[in-house]
């Protein structure tokens, strides 16, 4: 039985919860090998029994049988299309419709946000916010997509009165790192945690007595070992990707948390500065 085809064609027959299950299975069929009914139920906010009943409605004995059948169908389909379909990003191929691409991208980003927020140590995050709030000077380092995340954070921090350097040039990043002092903070953003330039800057900052805060993945890495504090980010992207989409989503969620936490710590003055910034930029229009 072609379950993927049956799921695609039976949309009008599904209840609200069944449609949630169908959408999830279609968007994540390439990753079902590692998905259990318990995980799926938790992510979708439904009961495990709803998933079992959905599988039985399609003609399978239970979720395990449906999952294995879908994996088999997906593998067979991939073998047929691999000769012509180009792999564009993670599980997205050139044969996917824009609607399927949208679902896959949205789910990838949703998972990055959910998993990153679930794994954050919020007591550690509060401590990091307090450390940053007392820093005379903050340096933010990053490369590529991580540099974009860093630049966004630097703008936010400057808006509420922090002295921040966030340079794109790696030579300048290294130069700033060696001039940091005790009490200063370096926020190093690198998902891999192994980029030579970022590790070099972290080493220099630590040597000068600055506090190094790494926004990185859970994987053991040189940056993770160097950092005084780490904030973990999770991304489901594979090595085969066209851009760090869900990685940036996870990183932005962490940097936005830092910003809002700092605003909350000094709410009256921060809000005054945000208001003044808004008034000044309005005058430029």
UniProtKB/Swiss-Prot annotation:
Q: Which terms are listed as keywords in the entry? A: Carbohydrate metabolism, DNA-binding, Repressor, Transcription, Transcription regulation
- Describe the location of the HTH rpiR-type domain by residue ranges: 1-77
Superkingdom as given in the UniProt entry: Bacteria
Transcription regulation among keywords: yes
Effects seen without this gene: Cells lacking this gene show an abolition of the extensive lag phase observed when grown on MurNAc and a 20-fold enhancement of murQ transcription.
Which PROSITE patterns would you find in this protein's record? HTH_RPIR, SIS
Q: Which HAMAP family match?
A: HTH_type_MurR
Q: How does it assemble?
A: Homotetramer.
Any idea what this protein is called? HTH-type transcriptional regulator MurR
What organism is recorded for this protein? Escherichia coli (strain K12)
This protein's gene is called murR
């Amino acid at each position: 039985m072609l379950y993927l085809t049956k799921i695609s064609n039976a949309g009008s027959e599904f209840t609200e919860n069944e449609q949630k299950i169908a959408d999830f299975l279609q968007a994540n069929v390439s990753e079902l090998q590692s998905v259990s009914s318990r995980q799926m139920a938790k992510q979708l906010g439904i009961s495990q029994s709803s998933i079992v009943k959905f599988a039985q409605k399609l003609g399978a004995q239970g979720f395990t049988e449906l999952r294995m059948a879908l994996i088999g169908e997906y593998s067979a389909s991939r073998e047929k299309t691999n000769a012509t379909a180009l792999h564009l990003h993670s599980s997205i191929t050139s044969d996917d419709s824009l609607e399927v691409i949208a679902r896959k991208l949205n789910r990838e980003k949703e998972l990055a946000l959910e998993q990153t927020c679930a794994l954050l140590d919020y007591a550690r995050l509060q401590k990091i916010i307090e450390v940053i709030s007392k820093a005379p000077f903050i340096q933010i380092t990053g490369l590529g997509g991580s540099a974009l995340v860093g630049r966004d954070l630097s703008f936010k921090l400057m808006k509420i009165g922090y002295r921040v350097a966030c340079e794109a040039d790696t030579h300048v990043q290294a130069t700033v790192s060696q001039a940091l002092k005790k009490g200063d903070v370096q926020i190093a953003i690198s998902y891999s945690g192994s980029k030579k330039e970022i590790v070099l800057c972290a080493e220099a900052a630590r040597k000068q007595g600055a506090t190094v805060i790494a926004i990185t993945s859970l994987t053991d890495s040189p940056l993770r070992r160097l950092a005084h504090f780490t904030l973990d980010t999770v991304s489901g992207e594979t090595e085969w990707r066209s851009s760090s989409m869900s990685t940036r989503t996870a990183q932005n969620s962490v940097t936005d948390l830092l910003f809002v936490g700092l605003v909350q710590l000094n709410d009256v003055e921060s809000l005054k500065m945000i208001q003044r910034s808004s008034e000044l930029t309005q005058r430029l229009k």
